[in-house]
């Protein structure tokens, strides 16, 4: 599997434009100007990732905008943006539903859908080498 993908001026990564597979870009990163400048130098216009499982949008010069504060399609036409799409299976923002986005080239629309986290939690608990907390947190969306 490739570490990243591009389509025109859009970059797709799992984690960060700097380290596409491992680096966390947490909401508080927006208060570290050097870090954010380095990240935004790596993208042309829009980047999508989700390593932290915290859906929302990063801007070059503003604080992180959490998904739950965005109503309807959000325009991504002026400036650069990093969109964290959240998580399809293990959300960490207090909402147990899966999170994904629809991108039409001009706007990002965050969507949520129910999934059977109880079934997933049971499967996790059956794996003896995994801590029970990994399954229990699914019920809290954490």
Which role does the model predict for each range below?
Residues 1-48, 52-66:
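Conserved catalytic scaffold of divalent metal-dependent phosphoesterases
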Residues 62-142:
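Acidic, His/Gly-rich catalytic cores of divalent-metal-dependent hydrolytic chemistry
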């Amino acid at each position: 599997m490739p570490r990243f993908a591009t389509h025109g001026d859009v970059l797709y990564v799992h984690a960060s434009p700097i380290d596409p597979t491992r680096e966390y870009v947490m909401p508080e990163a927006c208060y570290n100007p050097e870090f954010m400048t380095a990240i935004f130098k790596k993208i042309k216009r829009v980047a999508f990732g989700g390593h932290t499982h915290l859906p929302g949008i990063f801007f070059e010069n503003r604080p992180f905008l959490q998904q739950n504060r965005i109503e309807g399609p959000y325009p991504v036409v002026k400036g650069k943006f990093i969109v964290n799409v959240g998580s399809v299976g293990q959300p960490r923002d207090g909402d147990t539903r899966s999170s994904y986005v629809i991108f039409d080239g001009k706007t990002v629309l965050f969507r949520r859908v129910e999934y059977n986290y109880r079934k997933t939690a049971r499967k996790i608990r059956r794996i003896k080498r995994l801590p029970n907390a990994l399954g229990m947190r699914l019920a809290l969306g954490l």
